[in-house]
């Protein structure tokens, strides 16, 4: 029948989107793409920035808490700027992947996934803004770590919650779109920033 509605278009009409996916999928995919852009862009630049700019004597003295942190890591003796910056990067990367457990707990027990993701986005934005100033460098890293922890696991849970459990095929395609956003952010972060 030429005037009828096809079964394929029922999902599209029900979701209100031409793609058949909920509108929220594209917002969540875009947000996660930028989170991965942030992490991999920082990964490409953090050690280089610290060695070539931040750890220069005239700049390092302005970073709040940097001397104390360096003293803590130099308990076995002095280390080069490269070694110190590599340690900072290692802690940053490790904590970015550890804190989603904390973010998941906060979402499950206190705030809910949506609020936790929003707080994560705000923390990461504030962290990148704070990176603009030498004095707040370590505080900026802390904000980025916490923001990523609040966002990382909870945003995936939100994607899953967009779809009814009865439509695994559409849900699977939605996660493919979401994963594509992750890959685009991860690939473009180091290329654009570095």
Tell where the protein language model's regions lie, with residue ranges.
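Intracellular juxtamembrane helix-capping segments at the cytosolic ends
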Residues: 150-165
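Cytosolic juxtamembrane N-terminal segment immediately preceding the first transmembrane helix
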Residues: 1-42
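Glycine-rich segments within core transmembrane alpha-helices of 12-TM secondary carriers
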Residues: 96, 172-191
């Amino acid at each position: 029948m030429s005037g009828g509605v096809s079964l394929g278009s029922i999902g599209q009409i029900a979701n209100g989107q031409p793609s058949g996916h909920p509108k929220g999928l594209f917002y969540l995919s875009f947000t996660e793409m930028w989170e991965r852009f942030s992490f991999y862009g920082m990964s490409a630049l953090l050690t280089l920035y610290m060695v070539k700019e931040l750890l220069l004597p005239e700049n390092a003295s302005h970073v709040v808490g940097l001397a104390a942190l360096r003293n803590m890591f130099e308990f076995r003796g002095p280390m080069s700027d490269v070694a110190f910056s590599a340690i900072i990067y290692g802690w940053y990367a490790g904590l970015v992947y550890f804190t989603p457990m904390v973010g998941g707990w906060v979402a499950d027990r206190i705030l809910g996934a949506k609020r936790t993701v929003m707080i994560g986005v705000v923390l990461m934005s504030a962290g990148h803004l704070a990176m603009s100033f030498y004095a707040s460098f370590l505080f900026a890293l802390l904000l980025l770590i916490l923001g990523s922890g609040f966002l990382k696991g909870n945003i995936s849970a939100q994607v899953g919650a967009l779809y009814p459990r009865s439509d695994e095929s559409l849900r699977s395609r939605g996660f493919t779109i979401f994963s594509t956003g992750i890959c685009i952010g991860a690939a473009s972060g180091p290329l654009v920033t570095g």
